[in-house]
Design a protein with these regions (language model features):
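Glycine-biased, small-residue-rich flexible motifs in mid-sequence functional cores and linkers
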Residues: 2-9, 88-213
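Short, small/acidic-rich helices and loops at N termini and domain boundaries
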Residues: 1-94
């Protein structure tokens, strides 16, 4: 699958992001895997889009004609990300995690802030669980996370209430590494965990999302 992610689109981040503003992630992957070049994509007609199994064909065709508008929006997004210290990594970049490329629908972009080296960390463990956990469940998540963090594992969770929150806190309690996967870099939910997100960054952790902020 990695061999598919080569070609014309790999050389222009601004252009690739503009296409992501038009298409969803799955749609953009279709274009990447079609091996079309920039000019061919901009000139896609109704029949071409149908052949690529796209829906909402009329909208896509119109948006591609107005690519300059999306390039302007893309440039604005990139400038804003730079100001806010958020790194954008495309599936074409060397820093993109190899293991992420091999999933069925990999994100074309990942957005991150903090310790970028965690993207290549070899020892990772994810914690997933209910937001409405019992006190016992919270304690187990905290202690288990702390144990693995002490053994150099990067603790990955979603910064939500409950198990996620306990897992992050367990890692931080032993000055371990932890990564929070967010809806987007602006959407820290619940608001009460904004301080936890800041602590993750202060302690060499990482905030990560696949969606444009």
């Amino acid at each position: 699958m990695q061999d598919l992610f080569k070609g014309d689109l790999s050389f222009d981040l601004e252009y690739l992001l503009a296409l992501r503003l038009i298409f969803d992630n799955k749609g953009l992957l279709k274009l990447i895997n079609s091996n079309l070049n920039k000019e061919e994509i901009l000139n896609l007609k109704e029949l071409d889009l149908k052949n690529l199994n796209f829906k909402s064909i009329e909208r896509y065709e119109e948006d591609l004609k107005n690519i300059k508008k999306y390039l302007t929006l893309s440039k604005g997004v990139l400038e804003k990300l730079n100001k806010e210290g958020i790194k954008i990594i495309s599936i074409f970049d060397k820093g993109y995690p190899e293991r992420l490329k091999i999933i069925e629908i990999p994100p074309v972009f990942i957005f991150c802030k903090g310790n970028f080296s965690l993207l290549e960390n070899k020892k990772n463990i994810a914690f997933v669980g209910t937001r409405k956990c019992s006190e016992l469940g919270s304690t187990i998540a905290f202690k288990t996370s702390a144990f693995f963090a002490q053994n150099k594992f990067n603790i990955i969770s979603g910064l939500a209430k409950g198990i996620d929150e306990s897992a992050h806190k367990g890692a931080l309690s032993v000055d371990g590494l932890t990564t929070a996967v967010l809806v987007d870099m602006k959407s820290i939910s619940p608001n009460s965990n904004k301080n936890l997100a800041e602590e993750i960054l202060k302690k060499n952790g990482l905030l990560l999302s696949e969606n444009i902020p």
